[in-house]
Amino acid sequence: MAVTSSSSTCDGFFIISLIVIVSSLFGTSSAQLNATFYSGTCPNASAIVRSTIQQALQSDARIGGSLIRLHFHDCFVNGCDGSLLLDDTSSIQSEKNAPANANSTRGFNVVDSIKTALENACPGIVSCSDILALASEASVSLAGGPSWTVLLGRRDGLTANLSGANSSLPSPFEGLNNITSKFVAVGLKTTDVVSLSGAHTFGRGQCVTFNNRLFNFNGTGNPDPTLNSTLLSSLQQLCPQNGSNTGITNLDLSTPDAFDNNYFTNLQSNNGLLQSDQELFSNTGSATVPIVNSFASNQTLFFEAFVQSMIKMGNISPLTGSSGEIRQDCKVVNGQSSATEAGDIQLQSDGPVSVADM
């Protein structure tokens, strides 16, 4: 991965103000999260997470997008409680089996490596749900994006919610209205839809996530008319009709491994890879269009909005206090063993918007 040094555009005043504002928006449970939660019990937690991801990036350039996607998929189902990380057991149906996650989510091995390192340094202290939040921030800043103060203190859930994963996660094939409704259902707004979609500024997508646009869009017998003709030709070569759909390409064509605002300038030239990406700009009259234009012309504005949206998303229904537990192994509830051996799954797309209807 072409990692650049992080050049945060959010000054200290902005971050401090943002933490105060967001904490006040999400009630008592979220207000219990704070930036210094581990200062006395595991002061090097953030550094350990960052170091482990730096090592992972040496062999896997797309791991940053994958880790953010895990955090997104976790928070949208049952709140940010680490439930996505749980394997099948005799009493738990894993969220990994949902169409939006199966053959799609990846990076579990890196989460396990982070957990092992943290357990070695400070046993039984840092939750798996906090690992996902810290890993997301580290992934963004290591790719040249903004850095922010992560609010901590989440505890891990005791069960998974497969039916919730089946119904709550957005799909790259969905229309903008449906996707926005799913964001609103967890307390997010239109600006959050656009800013969090901006995480597609790095990562990869597999043919199956966008081949619906290449030959027979919405049953018309023609390609998606909002897809740039030059991009269309190259994608048709990568993903031929009736092919295996296993080809992989960059979500951001211009700077695929850097966290920047080029994702939005790509949308302005009809170079969004996924249907759900391009609809943010091509859906005439949508409230998302001026937001895309603003982020395309002002990277600082995008970075600030992205930080705010990540903090808001990380505050979705966390378990705090004595609720839940601190898992010893992110794959299983304490005292249980998994029914399946956890492992990485073949990537289909990185970033917040999920793969559904596989």
Curated annotation (Swiss-Prot):
Domain of life: Eukaryota
Cofactor (UniProt): heme b; Ca(2+)
Binding-site residues, Ca(2+) 2: 201, 252, 255, 260
E.C. designation(s): 1.11.1.7
Active-site residues from the entry: 73 (proton acceptor)
Annotated signal peptide: 1-31
Residues holding heme b: 200
Disulfide bonds: 42-122, 75-80, 128-330, 207-239
Catalysed conversion reaction: 2 a phenolic donor + H2O2 = 2 a phenolic radical donor + 2 H2O
Binding, Ca(2+) 1: 74, 77, 79, 81, 83
GO cellular component: extracellular region; plant-type vacuole
Site residues (Transition state stabilizer), renumbered to this chain: 69
Database matches in PROSITE patterns: PEROXIDASE_1, PEROXIDASE_2, PEROXIDASE_4
Additional remarks: There are 73 peroxidase genes in A.thaliana.
Name under which the protein is recorded: Peroxidase 54
Organism this protein belongs to: Arabidopsis thaliana (Mouse-ear cress)
